[in-house]
């Protein structure tokens, strides 16, 4: 079973910055047993990435809803995502780390939303106007901003 210390050490050894934007895509099944399961992994990653002002971004796509024209693609009252367990947990997971609360801030892109954890003002600014993006990777959208702001993609 992986502990917080194991994962923090591995991230540090890989050179994952703690003051940048990190887009994390995960397969919880591929990761294996983690202390605290899915919510434990979220807490571990939030603590590591936000320690020096970074933002942790987790895709929470809902594009699968396009198959049912009677359903909205993004329902802000639902925790539905079509890309796995960790993204679904992230939609509603609030982390409490060292006495500080980290709430998820979900972008409003109709098919390619993401949850962002970190400084509340920075997170809200990062996802602002996402619903106006003309594509899932528009330059002004969350995915388009990632390279422009020196962000990283972490496949876990």
Regions found by a protein language model. Give the residues of each.
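Internal, conserved structured core segments that host functional sites
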Residues: 66-156
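N-terminal active-site beta-alpha-beta segment that forms phosphate/nucleotide-binding
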Residues: 15-71
């Amino acid at each position: 079973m992986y502990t917080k210390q194991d994962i923090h050490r591995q991230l540090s050894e890989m050179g994952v910055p703690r003051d940048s934007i990190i887009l994390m895509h995960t397969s919880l099944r591929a990761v294996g047993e983690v202390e605290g399961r899915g919510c434990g992994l979220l807490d571990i990653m939030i603590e590591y990435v936000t320690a020096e002002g970074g933002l942790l971004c987790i895709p929470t796509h809902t594009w699968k809803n396009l198959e049912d024209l009677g359903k909205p693609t993004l329902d802000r009252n639902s925790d539905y995502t079509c890309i796995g367990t960790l993204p679904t947990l992230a939609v509603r997971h609030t982390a409490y780390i060292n006495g500080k609360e980290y709430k998820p801030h979900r972008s409003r892109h109709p098919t390619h939303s993401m949850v962002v954890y970190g400084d509340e003002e920075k997170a809200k600014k990062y996802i602002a106007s996402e619903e106006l993006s003309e594509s899932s990777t528009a330059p002004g959208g969350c995915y388009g901003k990632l390279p422009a702001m020196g962000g990283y993609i972490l496949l876990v």
